[in-house]
């Protein structure tokens, strides 16, 4: 970490409490962001992390916007929350399926994504699914673009977009589109906020798993959050914009 620190590293995202303590001890002025893999779903755990030195909490994907709002109202700490990308079928940071199934730890950034594989589902020895719903553990990707005003007004300080194992085209386009609508909301407010269908189509074209979902932010959707039919859909962007 020393060469990165000396080069001006802004902050580190940490999941392991031992690493957290090590960084706080040896780099006391380094900002620590508590990773979503810490499964912070409420005020009390987040307060403890702040007392230990965390400057930002990356909330669990399983929190709804009301819970995030309560966190913002009761705790003076930066909040970062996911708005676009993959959802885990398990609680953030608590899935060990990849470790068991292939020795690749999700908390070390090496998840093999066994949840994206097709499975046969049995009830009392009888198979109850078929090839039309065989991806029983695979959630749709999150897209919170339509509810961005609600996300911002809940107290979220920073929007998190999935980037791991994604190419530069994906990162550039998704960031560009979200930047456009953050600026729109800040300039026009809620009444002037309107999402162009073409931008949703572009997000869908570049990467999606059958359809998008807003995740847990506005409700618990259960089966509606799952991409049961197809594993993944990828295509080239239908429109290219100049990213400045």
Model-based region annotation:
Residues 62, 83, 89-149, 153-154, ...:
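Hydrophobic, secondary-structure "cap" segments at the distal end of domains
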Residues 15-27, 62-75, 168-170:
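Active-site-adjacent beta->alpha loops and helix N-cap segments on the catalytic face
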Residues 16, 49, 81, 161:
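Conserved, mostly hydrophobic/aromatic
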Residues 232-236, 240-243:
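Single conserved hydrophobic/aromatic residue that forms the stacking wall/gate
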Residues 1-48:
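N-terminal active-site wall of soluble small-molecule enzyme domains
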Residues 43-52, 66-73, 90, 145-154, ...:
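Catalytic cores of alpha/beta
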Residues 144, 150, 158-191, 195:
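Extended, domain-scale alpha-helical bundle/helix-rich regions
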Residues 11, 31-33, 56-58, 78-82, ...:
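Structural preference for beta-strand elements that scaffold enzyme active sites
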